[in-house]
């Protein structure tokens, strides 16, 4: 009997954690600003009408570096179709680390800096749960966050990250499905009048 109580308690705890870490999706993206240095910023609202992917990274994180490589490829392939990638380093020493990171990876999109608190607030990540990097946010052409992932999500597993990001980008760039046509009277069939 004690065993079943422990299992029940662990199940409830797991469900509470899962619901606590779930951000509200879909939701309108706040007009988040990424600091580019020298008083310059890039704002998400500048890209209304485009599909935007925001990557939150740590410059020294190998998974983040891999994500930046994949996103660089996506920007080059899909930029002309309306994709815009942005990235933000969130570690304490990001200002010192970012120039070397940019020289090494040469991403074809803006990369700046935000505090961890700004990033956690933007992603609606519970402060009581450890955040695993990177964080990716997918925003549609109307400014709605449709999906977001963090390092612990299977979406960002090393073996499938490029395939998963590509599929999500293609899904978001696809034209909306046409609404089904309403069924009406068939053409060429006359109704009999009585």
Over which residues does each language-model region extend?
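Bacterial N-terminal signal peptides that target proteins for export
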Residues: 1-8
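Hydrophobic h-region of N-terminal signal peptides that target proteins for export
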Residues: 11-20
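N-terminal "domain-start" segment that seeds a small globular fold
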Residues: 20-44
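Non-globular targeting/processing and membrane-anchoring segments
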Residues: 21-24, 29, 168-194
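Short active-site neighborhood of thiol/selenol oxidoreductases, capturing the structured segment around
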Residues: 44-62
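Hydrophobic beta-strand anchors of alpha/beta hydrolase catalytic cores
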Residues: 53-54, 85, 136
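Structural microenvironment flanking redox-active thiols in thiol-disulfide oxidoreductases
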Residues: 65-106, 116-123
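Thiol/disulfide oxidoreductase modules built on the thioredoxin-like
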Residues: 105-107, 116-164
């Amino acid at each position: 009997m004690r065993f079943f109580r422990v299992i029940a308690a662990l199940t409830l705890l797991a469900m509470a954690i899962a619901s606590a870490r779930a951000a509200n999706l879909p939701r309108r993206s706040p007009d988040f600003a990424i600091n580019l240095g020298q008083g310059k910023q890039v704002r998400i609202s500048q890209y209304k009408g485009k599909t935007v992917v925001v990557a939150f990274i740590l410059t020294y994180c190998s998974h983040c570096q891999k994500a930046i490589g994949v996103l660089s490829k996506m920007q080059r392939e899909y930029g002309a179709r309306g994709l815009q990638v942005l990235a933000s380093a969130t570690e304490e020493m990001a200002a010192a680390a970012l120039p070397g990171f940019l020289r090494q990876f040469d991403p074809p999109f803006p990369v700046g800096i935000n505090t961890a608190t700004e990033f956690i607030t933007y992603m609606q990540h519970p402060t009581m749960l450890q955040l695993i990097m990177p964080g990716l946010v997918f925003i549609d052409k109307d400014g709605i966050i449709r999906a977001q992932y963090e390092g612990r999500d299977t979406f960002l597993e090393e073996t499938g990250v490029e395939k998963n990001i590509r599929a999500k980008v293609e899904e978001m760039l696809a034209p909306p499905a046409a609404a089904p046509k309403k069924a009406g009277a068939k053409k060429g069939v006359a109704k009999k009048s009585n």
